[in-house]
């Protein structure tokens, strides 16, 4: 990657300049305006969220990273250790049928209707969960048209995190089924709303798993996984947002060198900078 940093710098410079030109043509007042419009959110709301998350870096993400480094026996936790499993994590796997029952029962405790909608994804084969050669990594829920059901894709390996992923994507799926009732023009939703539905479904399942934990060790692993999930969902995204804001502001002053781009990323990192 180091050998290609000039290429990466050229890509960043080109994309940032291309956006600046389009924003100027569209009379966008800031580089962020277009994204705020597509997300149906006011700039003031985003800024308030950003400030609250950044203010919480030391007492949340920094504190957790220090704890995890201690648990892993590390003096300094590197970025590749961020999502590493804890040494006390159980190797026991959760089979697909058990995962289905966990998610559906968690949904049913909140809303039987929500569980019934989610159940269709299993009974009608709307989910592709098996790991297969050539299959794309990751997970997503994808609507098609309002007259056809959505699909869920994930790679289920049987870990508790995979159960959380299933619950997350089914949250999207249930939302997409219900949104289809609004018709083709109104069923599409911005990310801000879509992720609210998915994280809500995930939290329902997490609370059920936590309540069912039999040992302090099991609770610790679940809670650590949830903290890491929230750091990935919220803290990391704010760091990306800050990096992009700083990058576009710097690019407006002229072409950037690899070192200048690296400095933008280092400055906005949510990790401690002692």
What kind of feature is each model-predicted range?
Residues 207-266:
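Long, well-structured alpha-helical subdomains associated
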Residues 153-166:
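Short pre-active-site segment immediately N-terminal to the catalytic Zn-binding motif
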Residues 176-197:
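Post-HEXXH active-site segment of zinc metalloproteases
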Residues 165, 169, 173:
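Catalytic glutamate of the conserved HExxH
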Residues 191-215:
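Post-HExxH zinc-binding segment in Zn-dependent metallohydrolases
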